[in-house]
């Protein structure tokens, strides 16, 4: 058996099934939010974990998961983020989306590509760059944002959140341009 990937930070997940999946894939400790009604005691746990070992927020690639990510991120600054593409988190019968459905390989890959929040960073990528790239409004915008989020490993979001994440994770103009070029090439096929 291969040596298990050891994670120093404490991983914030949504529930027990996510913890089981994480521990199956890597050697790590978790904090469970148990849904999107996050109690103050959970926020306090996450704050303490952030001070002692650091925190990686690893929630499901769906609306409740993004909501939980935002709540924790707002209340506990400086967290790291791991993202799982939606198609790697689908249940076998396509009923449900979650980390608990992901393969060990997908979980490890997401944890190898974590992003760190940077406070008060004015990024290189402007709102007009997103508009010019067809990522805001228009019939191709959603699918382009999905692809860009996957290529840049920052998850799928709406246009406003995409802009915020590009800033927060200090995505360079070069990385953005490379990903955009790939999206356009794929569309031509």
From Swiss-Prot:
Record-level Gene Ontology MF annotations? metal ion binding; ribonuclease M5 activity; rRNA binding
Reaction(s) catalysed by this chain, per the record, are:
Endonucleolytic cleavage of RNA, removing 21 and 42 nucleotides, respectively, from the 5'- and 3'-termini of a 5S-rRNA precursor
Gene3D superfamilies linked to this entry:
3.40.1360.10
PROSITE patterns reported in the protein's UniProt record: TOPRIM
Q: Where does Mg(2+) 1 bind?
A: 14, 60
Please list the residue ranges annotated as the Toprim domain: 8-91
Which GO terms of the cellular component aspect does the record hold?
A: cytoplasm
The record's subcellular locations are: Cytoplasm
Which UniProt keywords are present, listed alphabetically? Cytoplasm, Endonuclease, Hydrolase, Magnesium, Metal-binding, Nuclease, Ribosome biogenesis, RNA-binding, rRNA processing, rRNA-binding
Which InterPro entries is this protein grouped with? RNase_M5, RNase_M5_C, TOPRIM_dom, TOPRIM_RNase_M5-like
Which cystines does this chain contain? none
Entry's EC annotation: 3.1.26.8
Q: Which domain of life is it from?
A: Bacteria
The UniProt entry, under SUPFAM superfamilies, shows: Toprim domain
> For this chain's UniProt record, which GO biological process terms are given?
rRNA processing
Q: Name one Pfam family in it.
A: Toprim_4
| Record family assignment | Belongs to the ribonuclease M5 family.
What is the protein's known function?
Required for correct processing of both the 5' and 3' ends of 5S rRNA precursor. Cleaves both sides of a double-stranded region yielding mature 5S rRNA in one step.
* Protein known as: Ribonuclease M5
**Which organism is this entry from?**
Bacillus cereus (strain ATCC 14579 / DSM 31 / CCUG 7414 / JCM 2152 / NBRC 15305 / NCIMB 9373 / NCTC 2599 / NRRL B-3711)
Q: Which gene encodes it?
A: rnmV
């Amino acid at each position: 058996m291969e040596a298990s990937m050891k994670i120093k930070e404490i991983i914030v997940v949504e529930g027990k099934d996510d913890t089981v999946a994480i521990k199956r894939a890597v050697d790590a400790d978790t904090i469970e939010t148990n849904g999107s009604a996050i109690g103050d005691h959970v926020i306090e746990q996450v704050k303490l974990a952030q001070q002692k070992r650091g925190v990686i927020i690893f929630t499901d690639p769906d609306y409740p998961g993004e909501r939980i990510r935002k709540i924790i991120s707002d209340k506990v600054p400086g967290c790291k983020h791991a993202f799982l593409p939606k198609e790697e988190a689908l249940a076998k019968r396509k009923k449900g989306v979650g980390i608990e459905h992901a393969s060990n390989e997908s979980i490890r890959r997401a944890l190898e590509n974590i992003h760190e929040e940077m406070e008060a960073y004015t990024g290189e990528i402007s709102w007009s760059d997103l508009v010019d790239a067809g990522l805001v409004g228009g019939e191709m915008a959603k699918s382009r944002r999905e692809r860009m989020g996957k290529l840049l490993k920052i998850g799928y979001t709406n246009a406003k959140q995409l802009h915020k994440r590009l800033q927060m994770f200090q995505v360079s103009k070069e990385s953005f341009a490379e990903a955009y070029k790939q999206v356009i090439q794929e569309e031509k096929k």
